[in-house]
Amino acid sequence: EKKIMPKKIIGFSKLSREEKIDWLSEKIFDDSNQVRSILDNYLNSNKDIQAIHDSFSENSISNFYLPYSLSPNFLINNKNYTIPLVTEESSVVAALSNAAKFWFDKGGFKSKVESFTKRGHIHLSFNGDKEALKEFINNNREYILKSTDNITKNMKKRGGGISAINIIDKTSDLKNYFQLSIDFDTSDSMGANFINSCLEAMSKKIDELSKQYDYFIKSGYSINIIMSILSNYTPDCIVEAHAECDIKDLIDIEGIESEEFAKKMKYAFDIAKVDINRAVTHNKGIMNGIDAILIATGNDFRAVEAGIHSYASLNSKYESLSECTILDNKFRISIKIPLSVGTVGGITDLHPLVKLSLQILDS
């Protein structure tokens, strides 16, 4: 029996929204009108707003709604915040609101940014030694940086830009593999497009200069640029937060005496430090709240998730992101994570609810 190969659709992206829905209805739903009705019901009645949503992604045929919630009473560094949250998971907003209310009368949360360096890499193969590559980069550093002037001009005005270029020898891991590691300060933006644009410009300039570099020509050395891209691993973009209270203030919780509750809570945190089964679930709970505010503020929650989970493996094993300590009758919960976020750029300037979220946080 001859096997019938599935037919590939060509030019799907060029179809109108109506044509895409016709295709979906015909191929998957046997020409049912129900699918069109569902998709139409989730369109925005305001055509201008719908056009904004359509512009975010490709092949859009409708909107997928999630609840937009508020969690008040977050006292952070002695300022009272109302936190906008976007999540479909029940109990997340309730848990956050209860935690905020509990800690409000106990000094709230203390938080600080410890560092804010973001990093991108030019990945390349080079058939010479590190010193030859290092000399080439040092001799041409000014020209390499100058290639980004048009891109970095506005960022420099906001206090950001490129802060360092380092050569990393990775040949022990992969033959001829070197990295140029470039540090960035992206001010108040997440900076993904900015970083990638800078890396692309620098790569082109390096490729151009390397082909004219006398020593490389005479020695038979050549640089082959494999890719240029930012890294979502941001161990130098760190935020720390904590909350603490007297153990005696841990009252009316689960019907347990305050000292016993503190000990059980600390032990639960300690388990998440040593057992990966618990650590993954523990950290998922942390990300429930972080993801919700990232989505509400138009940030790339997938990038932040990737960076945070890699940070959880910093000690060569996956463990809890937060910890609990008991000292001098004080109960303290703390967390330190990489958090690369922005308040400008991306959909921040486009999505009306993202703008609203930032206004709520800034009030």
Regions found by a protein language model. Give the residues of each.
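Conserved phosphate/anionic-ligand binding catalytic regions in large, soluble enzymes, centered on
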Residues: P67-A95, T186-I195, K273-G298
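Hydrophobic alpha-helical scaffolding
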Residues: L43-K47, S60, L85-V86, N127-K130, ...
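A structural-propensity feature for long, helix-poor, extended segments
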Residues: K106-E142, A312-S363
